[in-house]
Amino acid sequence: MKSERLERTAVEAELAGLAGWALNDAASSISKTFKFSNFIEAFGFMTEAAITAEKLNHHPEWFNVYSRVDVTLNTHDAGGLTELDFKLARAMEKAAARRLR
């Protein structure tokens, strides 16, 4: 099933509930940098996020160095952002919160 690209107003409404996520200038992707206390916590976050991404069949672009994980989300097939991006972002927030207490 193809996800429909969200209009900018819908994107901004979704983004309002996600602290620290930034919208790129073209409104085609969102990104965030997560900082953890060490590599194990960062990798644990990535592992949990990867399981969710696989369940959603929606995969992030990400980069990890030690305790930092940079994430960018968009839906290539839709040419921008869809509800899948925000579902994955919310799941990532929950995974991060379990490690950032």
From Swiss-Prot:
Its EC number is 4.2.1.96. One of its GO terms (biological process) is tetrahydrobiopterin biosynthetic process. GO terms for molecular function: 4-alpha-hydroxytetrahydrobiopterin dehydratase activity. InterPro entries: PCD_sf, Pterin_deHydtase. It is an enzyme of class 4 (lyase). It catalyses: (4aS,6R)-4a-hydroxy-L-erythro-5,6,7,8-tetrahydrobiopterin = (6R)-L-erythro-6,7-dihydrobiopterin + H2O. Signal peptide: none annotated. Coiled coil: none annotated. Keywords: Lyase. It comes from the Bacteria. Disulfide bonds: none annotated. Pfam families: Pterin_4a. HAMAP family: Pterin_4_alpha. Belongs to the pterin-4-alpha-carbinolamine dehydratase family. This is Putative pterin-4-alpha-carbinolamine dehydratase. It comes from Rhizobium etli (strain ATCC 51251 / DSM 11541 / JCM 21823 / NBRC 15573 / CFN 42).
